Regions:
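N-terminal pre-domain and mature-chain start segments
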Residues: 1-112, 125-137
């Protein structure tokens, strides 16, 4: 087994931003149509790779809410900006740790980000609920 670099994780929860936006929607300061704009690729990735949520959609109240994860990194090349399952992301993180053993976070490709997006398959509500940045070290 190859040596791997310890990884540093910085997690930004966007739950407060989500709550603020939903409050504005309920107060009619933001149009419902403006938050029901999931792209076809986001919906498709949520259908195939998304994990079901226990909570209902905050807009249509159906239990069709999924969490889908997208990975981004120069290190990934063409695979950057793609949706992945939790298992696939774990494998990417393992490969990333091996590839960056002995490197420093200042290298341009030594950062990987994971975006977790909440998506409703019914009404197309979507919101970036979590942003995680992973670096060696």
């Amino acid at each position: 087994m190859s040596p791997s670099a310890p990884l540093s994780h910085r997690v930004e929860s966007r739950e407060l931003d989500r709550a603020r936006l939903l409050s504005k929607v309920r107060g009619h300061a933001v149009a419902v149509s403006s938050v029901r704009d999931a792209s076809p690729s986001l919906i498709a990735s949520a259908e195939v790779l998304g994990e079901s949520c226990q909570k209902p959609c905050p807009i249509c109240h159906r239990k069709t809410l999924k969490l889908t994860r997208w990975i981004h990194s120069k290190w990934l090349g063409e695979k950057s900006g793609t949706a992945r399952s939790v298992r696939e992301i774990q494998k990417v993180l393992e490969d990333f740790a091996v590839a960056h053993a002995g490197s420093t976070a200042s290298e341009t490709d030594a950062e990987l980000s994971i975006h977790t997006v909440e998506v409703c398959l019914h009404c197309k509500w979507n919101f970036l609920v979590r942003h995680e940045v992973v670096t060696p070290g």
